[in-house]
UniProtKB/Swiss-Prot annotation:
Organism the protein comes from: Solanum lycopersicum
Pathway(s): Flavonoid metabolism
Keyword Transferase recorded: yes
Subunit organization: Homodimer.
E.C. code: 2.1.1.-, 2.1.1.82, 2.1.1.155
Protein name: Myricetin 7/4'-O-methyltransferase 2
Length: 356
């Protein structure tokens, strides 16, 4: 029987199931954070056998209240549903890490654990919860609505939050640096003698590149509170300063996840600064950009959804955005670059080489 608004019973049941998925979705990151706090990914990773029984897992959990042990299989059940762990019933209720679960292992070279913990920081969650209020006020970002100042000013004023943010960027950089020096991006750094990593944070990417290419001088440029007392060695150097003021001269410049933090006007301004600081195209000059290229790739719905959510995050946090290829091309031309090449082998993000 159809209801008055022409929704059949089957459609209503399907809609209700979907709505409950949205309602309960707040528990997903909470359960994952709980697993990280308990050290479950690390315990499974360090276990001698790939499959660990439930009883052994419970015994290995530090500081677990004995009265709460019955909750662990409940927690593990939902984490299996999320795809973090495999469940092996025939091995005595055993568990093993999935590829996604391995990304939550502490200090894993391909991990994004620190980025997950940053996303669950109260300051970040407060921003997301303030979007409705922000849409009614005159402030530039929801971050300012929630926390009273811009993201960058907040980082400069709050050492704890700044540390969590830098850890997240460093974790992502470790993952990305492994891809950059792999076959995925073969040839990008070949022939270069000097490289400036703008906004390179703690230097994770530059260190990996410097290690893979000993004859390539790598300079990390970032703000003083980010560089702090970090010292370089060998072919790695740290320079404190603003990218909008002065960029050291080099063959090439690396912008990893930088431009999506800024609006079009500031991006063009920064790209012009980069163009002034690199060699000519004939001498190998280029700017290497690692950023997202928005696309409607309907063959990968999860990728598209992640890109849409990332675009939303950039808009409410920095008053910036993710960009389509046409939007990128417009920036490059306005900044005076002659051409570009895209390497689409970095999953959610792409590598773009632009030439003076």
């Amino acid at each position: 029987m159809a209801s008055n608004n022409n929704i059949c019973a089957y459609e209503l049941i399907e809609a209700e199931a979907q709505s409950w998925d949205y309602i309960l979705s707040y528990l997903r990151p909470s359960c994952i954070k709980c697993a990280i706090q308990l050290g479950i990914p690390d315990i499974l990773h360090k276990n001698a056998d790939p499959i660990m029984s439930l009883s052994d897992l419970i015994a290995a959990l530090p500081n677990l209240n004995p009265s709460k042990t019955t909750f662990i299989p409940i927690l593990m059940r939902v984490l299996v549903d999320f795809g973090l762990f495999n469940y092996h019933q025939q091995q005595g209720d055993g568990y093993s890490l999935t590829t996604v679960g391995r990304l939550l292992v502490e200090n894993h070279h391909f991990g994004n654990r620190s980025f997950f913990l940053f996303a669950q920081h109260p300051v970040v969650l407060n921003t997301a919860a303030s979007v409705g209020d922000w849409l009614k006020d005159d402030l530039r970002t929801a971050f300012e609505t929630a926390d009273g100042k811009s993201h960058w000013d907040y980082c400069g004023a709050d050492p704890e939050f700044n540390g969590v943010f830098n850890d997240a960027m460093a974790g992502d950089s470790r993952l990305m640096s492994n891809l950059l020096i792999s076959d995925c991006c073969a040839g990008v750094f070949e022939g270069l003698t000097s490289l400036v990593d703008i906004g390179g944070g703690t230097g994770a990417v530059a260190m990996a590149i410097a290690g893979a290419f000993p004859s390539l001088k790598c300079i990390v440029l970032d703000l003083p509170h980010v560089i702090a007392d970090r010292k370089g060695s060998g072919n790695l150097e740290f320079v404190a300063g603003s990218m909008f003021d002065k960029i050291p001269h080099a063959n090439a410049i690396l912008l990893k996840w930088i431009l999506h933090n800024w609006d079009d006007e500031d991006c063009v301004k920064l790209l012009k600064k980069c163009k002034e600081s690199i060699s000519s195209r004939e001498n190998g000059g280029k700017v290497i950009i690692i950023d997202m290229i928005m696309e409607d790739n309907y063959n990968n719905k999860q990728l598209v959804q992640s890109q849409h959510l990332m675009d939303l995050i950039m808009r409410i946090t920095y008053a910036s955005k993710e960009r389509t290829e046409k939007e990128w091309e417009k920036l490059f031309l306005e900044a005076g670059f002659s051409g570009y090449k895209i390497i689409t082998s970095l999953g959610l993000r792409s590598l773009i080489e632009i030439y003076p």
